[in-house]
């Protein structure tokens, strides 16, 4: 079974995260930031993963550190759980609508970290539970850099912060589910490694 547990501790945050790509789904999520918990549960449900997260951060300062470090821990766990990449689908894309919002996520479990996401171009109004689309960028940057994947996220329509962030997590979850499936033999690269 492809699974990993990571722990990350800094002067600003503490994160313990368990990710399972196969087998049972679900798991308890408690970060101390209810909206982040809600988003991680979207990732868990729509990605069909086992995802358990316990985290604490300096929320009295800002949500930035906690959101970013949970993304880093998720990336670390994803990289470890994927192992050598044998049999992976590797590439995936997913759309996620939520009322007026439509988001597209395209990713490649390439071993090459790159995030293509420009929140300054998104016409989003406000934030949801202290989290906005700039915090989403920090979460994704942590995931991409430590999970070593290429990720493109596009907002096709929408302005309401809650819907934009939630649709982004749902699209990410669906794309990750597809890309992490084992559908073949060997490493899906002409180089022989990811």
UniProtKB/Swiss-Prot annotation:
EC number: 4.2.1.19
Classification via InterPro entries: IGPD_sf (IPR038494), ImidazoleglycerolP_deHydtase (IPR000807), ImidazoleglycerP_deHydtase_CS (IPR020565), Ribosomal_Su5_D2-typ_SF (IPR020568)
GO MF: imidazoleglycerol-phosphate dehydratase activity
Amino-acid biosynthesis keyword on record: yes
Leader sequence segment: none
Annotated keywords: Amino-acid biosynthesis, Cytoplasm, Histidine biosynthesis, Lyase
Keyword Lyase: yes
GO biological process, alphabetically ordered: L-histidine biosynthetic process
Top EC group: lyase
Chain coiled-coil ranges: none
Membrane-spanning residues: none
Sequence similarity: Belongs to the imidazoleglycerol-phosphate dehydratase family.
Name this polypeptide is given: Imidazoleglycerol-phosphate dehydratase
Lineage: Bacteria, Thermotogati, Deinococcota, Deinococci, Thermales
